């Protein structure tokens, strides 16, 4: 099959939401509908041995939150779906942001009782920057919810995106009876039930069908009136607005009861964009090009506790990956052979014989691959737009057992390569300072150092409030700056000079004093 045909049948997307909106449940249900798992392991019963398929890391299993991006591939009808599960927890913004550089569209999950929440607003800002097309699933309709019209108003006013309802709920909470599909003019009746089976919902054709009155009684005429109102007050779905990221189609349902998910998935494969072209520092790379290219957006250490491994996640941008092929590693300016790239089904890994644009493959990494690296078949361009963010929280790392220094350094280096934490080594001391965007990341590092590297540490507060990457083309100025400011300077894990500011005021004064130097909050990988 040609590159064009393989590309056309693929959909690569991420699910974004506030914690507890039901993202992990919906992820499982999509896998269930795609036939990728037989049994949706209700994620709340975490004490049982059955954990959510997409939360594979030990700490995630204990806490019940997704803290790293998981990658899952599954077929649905004539399509192949690549689903990237993003961390719902607020501390993992950076990992989530980079994941959103690797997808062509996103699915936003909103809790019908809570509406738009802070985390959703943050993630929408990222999607807006990239004009990412977004579909919306309003979840938990089987519980007491806010009025649906009110939810649409809130999405439009806070997230600044037009809403186009595709399905509309009939009742809510214990009176939830089903959904009306505005485009199909059909009603799907709700049957609360078997969490683990994909049940066929009873379908009634046409909103004016007398059968509806038999099934719903007075609710039928209420529904007709409400739909008239909804049609008058909302935007009709049009694909162009959706693809530009200006309009979001809205679906209602209950993920835990498998209801409304099939309608969402059908619309998704039909309307969501296939893999798109990608910008580089020299040209736009189109997916249908014959030559292979791709970029690394994530690195994960120790995915398999049985093997001390590091996997680099690469999004294929063009051409075809074939087992054993040679690829050019642009940053290192050298050719490598890729013998055993992996494909993923959330922690289950298989060797990939071939892969196509939109697919995510895992490369075994022995410390030579970094986030943001580009692989091609000889061309020397670099994919752009994969960011690193300055840390906002800092801890001094001290060993409980001084003989474990080597293991500590190895652990911190490998874990910081994943990009969720940053390791800083001050110029004028042997101390190790860990930086993060959120507090939970320190817990994750402490847990993983102890469990994966057998290293116990004490984490102490340190007099640093923020970090900035130092950029200066004038070598003489930079040398003078290094001498005068050495007590506040450190190298990050990638060897980049960083200013560790003891206070905001100090940073402002230093920036004023050194106008020739750029103090950057983000850095392209």
Swiss-Prot record:
One Pfam family, short name: RF3_C
GO biological process: regulation of translational termination; translational termination
Subcellular localization(s) per the UniProt record: Cytoplasm
Source organism superkingdom: Bacteria
Matching InterPro entries: EF-G-like_DII (IPR053905), EFG_III/V (IPR035647), G_TR_CS (IPR031157), P-loop_NTPase (IPR027417), PrfC (IPR004548), RF3_C (IPR032090), RF3_dom_3_sf (IPR038467), RF3_GTP-bd (IPR041732)
Alphabetized UniProt keyword annotations: Cytoplasm, GTP-binding, Nucleotide-binding, Protein biosynthesis
SUPFAM superfamilies: EF-G C-terminal domain-like (SSF54980), P-loop containing nucleoside triphosphate hydrolases (SSF52540), Translation proteins (SSF50447)
Residue ranges occupied by any tr-type G domain in the UniProt entry: 8-276
Molecular function as annotated in GO: GTP binding; GTPase activity; guanosine tetraphosphate binding; translation release factor activity, codon nonspecific; translation release factor activity, codon specific
Positions with a binding annotation for GTP: 17-24, 85-89, 139-142
Gene Ontology annotations for the cellular component aspect, listed alphabetically: cytosol
Entry function: Increases the formation of ribosomal termination complexes and stimulates activities of RF-1 and RF-2. It binds guanine nucleotides and has strong preference for UGA stop codons. It may interact directly with the ribosome. The stimulation of RF-1 and RF-2 is significantly reduced by GTP and GDP, but not by GMP.
Family label: Belongs to the TRAFAC class translation factor GTPase superfamily. Classic translation factor GTPase family. PrfC subfamily.
UniProt cross-references to PANTHER family, sorted A to Z: PEPTIDE CHAIN RELEASE FACTOR RF3
Protein name: Peptide chain release factor 3
Native source organism of the sequence: Coxiella burnetii (strain RSA 493 / Nine Mile phase I)
Name of the encoding gene: prfC
């Amino acid at each position: 099959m040609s590159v064009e045909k393989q590309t056309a049948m693929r959909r690569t997307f991420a699910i974004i939401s506030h914690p507890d909106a039901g993202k992990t449940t919906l992820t499982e249900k999509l896998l269930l509908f795609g036939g990728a798992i037989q049994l949706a392991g209700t994620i709340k019963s975490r004490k049982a041995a059955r954990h959510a398929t997409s939360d594979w890391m030990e700490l995630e299993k204990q806490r019940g939150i997704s803290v790293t991006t998981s990658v899952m591939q599954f077929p649905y009808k004539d399509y192949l779906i690549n689903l990237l599960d993003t961390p719902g927890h607020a501390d993992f913004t950076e990992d989530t942001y980079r994941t959103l550089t690797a997808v062509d569209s996103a699915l936003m999950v909103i809790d019908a009782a809570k509406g738009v929440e802070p985390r959703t607003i943050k993630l929408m800002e990222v999607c807006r920057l990239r004009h990412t097309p977004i579909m919306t699933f309003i979840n938990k309709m089987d519980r007491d919810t806010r009025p649906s019209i009110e939810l649409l108003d809130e999405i439009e006013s806070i997230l600044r995106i037009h809403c186009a309802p595709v399905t509309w709920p009939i009742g809510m909470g214990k009176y939830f009876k089903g959904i009306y599909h505005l485009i199909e003019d059909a009603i799907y009746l709700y049957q609360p039930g078997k969490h683990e089976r994909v049940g066929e919902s009873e379908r009634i054709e046409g909103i004016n069908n007398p059968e509806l009155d038999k099934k719903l009684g007075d609710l039928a005429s209420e529904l007709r009136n409400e739909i008239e109102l909804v049609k008058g007050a909302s935007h009709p779905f049009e694909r162009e607005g959706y693809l530009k990221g200006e309009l979001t189609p809205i679906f209602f349902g209950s993920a835990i009861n498998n209801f409304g998910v099939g309608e969402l998935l059908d619309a998704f494969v039909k309307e969501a964009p296939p893999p798109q072209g990608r910008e580089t520092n020299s040209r736009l790379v189109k997916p249908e090009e014959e030559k292979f290219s791709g970029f690394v957006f994530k690195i994960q250490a120790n995915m398999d506790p049985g093997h001390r491994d590091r996997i680099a996640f690469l999004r294929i941008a063009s051409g075809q990956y074939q087992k054993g092929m040679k690829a050019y590693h642009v940053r290192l300016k050298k050719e490598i052979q890729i013998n055993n790239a992996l494909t993923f089904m959330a922690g289950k890994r298989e060797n990939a014989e071939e892969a196509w644009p939109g697919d995510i493959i895992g490369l075994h990494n022995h410390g030579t691959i970094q986030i943001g690296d580009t692989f091609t078949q000889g061309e020397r361009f670099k994919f752009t737009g994969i960011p690193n963010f300055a840390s906002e929280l800092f801890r001094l790392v001290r060993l409980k057992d001084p003989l474990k220094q080597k293991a500590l350094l190895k652990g911190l280096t490998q874990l910081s390569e994943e990009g969720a934490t940053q390791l800083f080594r001050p110029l004028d001391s042997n101390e190790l300072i860990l930086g993060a965007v959120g507090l939970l990341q320190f817990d994750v590092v402490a847990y993983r150092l102890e469990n994966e590297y057998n290293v116990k540490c004490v984490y102490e507060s340190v007099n640093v409030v923020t970090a900035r990457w130092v950029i200066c083309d004038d070598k003489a100025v930079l040398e003078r700056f290094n001498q005068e400011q050495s007590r506040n300077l450190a190298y990050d894990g990638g060897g980049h000079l960083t200013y560790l500011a003891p206070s905001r005021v100090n940073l402002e004064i230093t920036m004023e004093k050194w106008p020739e130097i750029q103090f950057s909050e983000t850095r392209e990988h």
